[in-house]
Amino acid sequence: MNRKKIVSAMLIVTLTCGLGLTACGGAQGSVSGTEEAEVQRYAWPLGSSSPEDTVTQIYAEKFAEEVERLSGGSMKISVYPNSVLGGDRELLESCKDGDIPFVVQNTAPQVTFMKDTAVFDMPALFETIDEVREHVDNPEFMELMQQVYHDGGYELLGYADQGFRVMTTNKKVENLSDFKGQKIRTMENSYHMAYWKNLGASPTPMTFSEVYIGLQQGTIDAQENPYEVIVSNKLYEQQDYVVETNHLPHLISLIVSEEFFD
C-alpha cells in the first residue's frame, strides 16, 4: 500500500472519529509475503498525556482500531497514554519533527505553537456543550482550523471534547471575592492565566502529573479541569468543593505530523 493510499485511509478514519464519539517513533515496516502476494506492514506510535480511563484515550483507541480495520490489518497504531512519550509540549515538538506521527491532546497547550488556536481559550463564550459541538462541527470553521494547523507544521484530523472545565478547591466559593488569592493550577497558557488573574486568583502553571501532590502538599489550593479528569485522577481526595465555572470547553484534537502526512 503506497503513501497516498495510507493518507486516504486516515482521512476516512477521521470521518468516523469526530465529535460524535463524545456524544455517544517513526514508521517501522516489515515485509511478509506468500507466493500470491506481498503485504507491506506499518506500525506507528500515537502519544497522549491523558490517563487511560478518559475520552481522550477512547478517541485515540477508536482511531487506531479504524486505521487497522480500514487497512486490512496492514497498518497498526500503538497508543501511549499517561505522558509515556512526553508531556503536552514534548509531544507537540516530537510530532512536528516527525518522531511521533500522531498526537491526541487538549488544544490549550497548542497556543504556544499556533497562536490562532487561542480561539478555544475565550472564557464564558458558550452556554452549553451542544453549542460548542455545533460550532466545531461547522465545515467552514474546520477548514479554517485545518489551515492553522497546516501552517504550524501539523495536519488536523478531527476534534472531540470532554465537556466544560470546572474548578475544584478547598475553599467555598459563593461570590467573586472568594477567588481572591487562591493559588490555582493552570496549564501553560497565557489566556487561561489571565482569566484567573482577573478573577483575583493566583494562577500557577504546573504539569498535570504534579497536580495531585501539589494539592496534597499545599503548593496549590485549587485546580480546573473537566469532571472526567477530576474523577479519573481522584482529585476529589484532596478537594472539598466543585465550582461549576464552565469557563472553557475542553477540546481534544487529533493531529498528525505534516512531514509524515506529506
Describe each model-derived feature in a short phrase.
Residues 25-131, 140, 147-262:
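N-terminal secretory/targeting leader peptides
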Residues 134:
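Short beta-strand-centered segments that line the small-molecule binding cleft or hinge
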Residues 1-43:
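Short, low-complexity disordered leader/linker segments with a strong preference
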